[in-house]
Regions:
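N-terminal secretory signal peptides and thylakoid transit peptides that target proteins
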Residues: 1-14
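A structural signal for small-residue-enriched, beta-sheet-centric alpha/beta enzyme cores
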Residues: 32-109, 113, 124-363
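Active-site-surrounding "flap" and adjacent substrate/cofactor-binding loops of secreted or lumenal enzymes
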Residues: 119-122
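Solvent-exposed, non-transmembrane regulatory segments of membrane-associated proteins
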Residues: 17-19
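Boundary at the C-terminal end of the N-terminal hydrophobic targeting segment
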Residues: 27-29
């Protein structure tokens, strides 16, 4: 069977079926079919709540994935310019087993301050790792670079993280230009003048009694590609502003990009499951989730990206995870979340902002 036909098959093994895929429809403003993606959201995983804070002063914000009661955490960092917090603690050889939230934030390294607000929110409610007379909330975090969009002095802080927690819900989170995806852009190998809008997206799939979901803030230096067709969904535009064949195609034709500053991009996300995981399994699942980034972003894991994927396992199903199956699902939901992020995004325009169209706005 052809690889793509197999990938879109409803049957994924273990006698169970995946959630149906959305059918292709005509893309707004163009003739290419809309990419096929999984439905659902990371909040379909029991024990997961998500909240966004979106700054109204410029496009930036943060997104919190709450696991207040504790979840086994893992992480895998593949980009060369990451900005992270508490990732060493997720090493399987280290002590603490569970995390209480994961924060994704804009604002580059400044945005890591938002994690302090998440910690305060959790502490006020008595959640955290028991350490003598106190409970210490464990909140790993990762950031993306959006300081080139509007006033760079405006970035997420502790109050932003706290507000994201206050907004958290078990319902489907809003996608597109919100939270950590508010200032995200993609297709920047040839500069912001030819870029398109990124965003944040989510998806999930259930096999048997186990659910796997993802949420991804897409701010890649590379292009977002539909893996089924190989076409650019959102990415480097032509010099005259049209949807182009992509940065990789341009490079192959000898059109080399200018020098870029490391850390100018970064895609970050979380994969969640209700399966029972060990820390080693959680880390492996985060590694396999990066396959979803590699299928939908080209190039990915570059010197200019700090691509980071977290995993949280709530264990609510009470079932051990089949790592082969869950790795397949983690890559699939991650890929779908990437596509949904740019499909739901809204373009940038206005005073002090670059003009950056979204996928829905150009042919």
């Amino acid at each position: 069977m052809h690889r793509r036909a197999f990938a879109s098959s409803a049957t994924l093994g273990l006698g169970a079926t995946a959630l149906p895929l959305a059918g292709p429809v005509a893309a707004q403003g163009g003739t290419a079919p809309r990419p096929t993606t999984l439905g659902g959201a990371i909040t379909d995983v029991p024990g997961i709540r998500v909240g966004h804070f979106t700054d109204t002063r410029r496009p930036t914000g943060c997104t919190v994935v709450l696991t207040e009661e504790g979840a086994v955490g893992g992480v895998d960092v593949r980009g060369a310019a990451p900005g992270t917090r508490e990732t060493d603690l997720l090493d399987p050889s280290n002590l603490v087993e569970q995390v209480h939230a994961i924060l994704l934030s804009g604002g580059s390294a400044f945005g890591l301050d938002a994690a302090a607000g998440v910690v305060r929110w959790l502490e006020e409610r008595g959640f955290g790792f028991p350490a003598g007379p106190v409970r210490v909330p464990i909140v790993p975090a990762a950031i993306l670079f959006d300081l080139g969009v509007g006033n760079p002095a405006i970035r997420p802080n502790a109050a932003s993280g706290y507000q994201a927690c206050e907004a958290a819900s078990a319902g489907p989170p809003v996608e597109g230009s919100v939270g950590a995806g508010a200032g995200a852009t993609v297709g920047k190998l040839f500069g912001m003048a030819r870029a398109m809008k990124g965003g944040i997206g989510t998806a999930s799939v259930r096999v048997g009694r186990v659910t796997v979901g993802a949420i991804v803030a897409v701010n890649a230096v590379g292009d977002v590609i539909d893996p089924a067709s190989g076409l650019v969904v959102a990415g480097t535009r032509t010099v005259d502003g049209r949807r182009g064949p992509g940065a990789a195609a341009a490079i192959l034709q000898g059109d080399l990009p200018p020098a870029l500053q490391p850390g100018m991009a970064t895609t970050i996300g979380v994969v969640a499951t209700d399966a029972v995981l060990t820390k080693a399994q959680a880390r492996k699942l985060a590694q396999m989730a990066h396959d979803g980034l590699a299928r939908t972003i080209e190039p990915v894991h570059t010197l200019w990206d700090g691509d980071t994927m977290f995993t949280v396992g709530t264990g609510r199903s009470g079932l051990p995870g089949n790592m082969m199956v869950m790795g397949v699902l983690a890559a699939r939901v991650t890929a779908s979340a990437v596509l949904r992020a740019v499909l739901a995004a809204k373009g940038l325009s206005g005073p002090e902002l670059p003009s950056v169209p979204a996928a829905s706005e150009i042919g």
